[in-house]
């Protein structure tokens, strides 16, 4: 272990020596740049662009370009990047993560690699965790970029598509991580090229990269459309039922936060819903509602997992930042179950039209880099998932903060008494204090206790995060007491007020350890910026969530020996700190495994999504007749239909092929079984294809010009692709839930998901081509079709998709359940295109 640690340290030192060498070269240009006039310095941007066009690489331009930005920052902002900031900028340009402590000037550090990469003209995205930071950084640092002749855009959720397009077309675009992701998904749902807003993804520099790429990695971005639902009463009934249960009627597994009915609970459910057997197959839907109601009532906690807004909306609370996640909903009906629990309006369930995880979203950039003060603990994940190294950057001044040993109390009550007493003592002498909590509930509790103690303070949590930047900015003033949920206000520096250094600087008090060491380090890092004095102190109790769920037997045995009889007894031990860290490592390992599994599943969809989106983009951007593509689909559809009956009785095969041709290709009277008998399969395929081509030409002749033909072809393909893709996403989601159970049968769920997902994708492609063929051949096309197509193109909304899906099923001829499907798939009608009708 010691050898491994030594090797890691030596590697870091070697990397720092390389960075320092390049940084010195950047510094060597300082006098030269300082001697230039404003006009000459500004002219360097055009010079760099020309040199890049002539073949110089960005790496060759780096020393001089970084020097230009340093001088520009000095003239425009009055700030001159230190050597350690230059080193951080080099790491960012290389597509890695410089670990820079709080207050070391990460925002200024980013200006150098952002400027350099913008020279290539392919766009640079600076990603922040909220719109306040996007707007702030774009406004402040944008002055430097604009002065140097680069355009800067801010992408906000409220902007129109035209405004977003303008922002993305700038050299540098500031945006939140969620908005970039949603814009990508929406771009792949439009039916006209002019409605797209993004350019190809080039370089992303992510601020607070651990928050975006690690903490939010488990939460997919989902674009969904409403699906009419009559199930609200079931949510309410299930909620009413579980509220009648006592603690013996359900079983909770605390470490995994799962819950299920006990035997007595099952008996009560069967009695309540008048069932003979709750787990009969026809009751599967009901058990799903009951499971969600159990989770909502006994696992999901108000003010910890979610809050209820003033207008009665359930808002998810991000467990890592303490902020509410606007627009996000718990999936799989859990959100509706919580709405039933809290007695607010139950919103309709939705059907996913497009989704992507942050992991796969950001891996699509040509180059990805990020900044944070705390990433070393997640180094393995950054390397394996994103191919990014973590390079710790030295501080410009030595850290003067004192980190005190953790204090452990027997109960929550005794711990909070000690916290209030500590705050009272420090506040009396004027020392500013930041109290960090992991939940809104704890913030409110401590706030009430401080009010009782007569201590004025500010509370910063998920309920008032609009004021968070202002509150955090004042947290370093003399006598200030601030309670902050987790890492609320992250990204805003706490600067010490006058006379505070002499009082010991800002004191950070942690009210419990978070399950992630990184979050604890972030809280500590709010104090002691740029060599300022400061202190940190964590208070723990045996009743803390982390200690209850993951406290080891060694801790319990140690505490038994200490005989904690007195409620206010406190333990201060290095061994305790090591055991807590060990528990945190276990949790981090569990969370990493979960994120890894999410990625493995999403990688299956990623490959399929990229194929669909690439083909979609080809259709949207095509300014030509798409006839060759449609004819190829027709040919493959005919081939599949004929091949599906190759092994059947010859008479039955011919009859089935004729049925397929009449329902999907040609007018009913234009083909008969008689003319196909005696022909070989290849001859039948060719005959049907030639007939289909004649019909195809007849159909297009009804459109008045080439422009109308191209528009009709595009809308036809895109509408069908979008319908089938939406259905496929839903099917993959159901498959994922189903294969999860196969782990109990010693089968690898991910491998099964990959295999079955691939087969389903092939089936979907066949279904797309069949629907394009049938619609092309059978559609009633009139002269005004172009106007109708154009109108449909501007309203490609999920509700249109729903009606289109219904229309497709209704167009099928009357076929009995167990007959072969006329699409030629070889499946029974009830298992193919008839599935939706019968369901």
Curated annotation (Swiss-Prot):
GO BP field: intracellular protein transmembrane transport; protein import; protein targeting; protein transport by the Sec complex
Compositionally skewed regions (Polar residues) per UniProt: 791-809
Taxonomic source organism: Streptococcus pyogenes serotype M5 (strain Manfredo)
Compositionally biased residues, Basic and acidic residues: 780-790
GO CC entries: cell envelope Sec protein transport complex; cytosol; plasma membrane
Topology within the bilayer: Peripheral membrane protein
Family of this protein: Belongs to the SecA family.
Catalytic reaction equation(s): ATP + H2O + cellular proteinSide 1 = ADP + phosphate + cellular proteinSide 2
Enzyme class: translocase
Name recorded for this polypeptide: Protein translocase subunit SecA
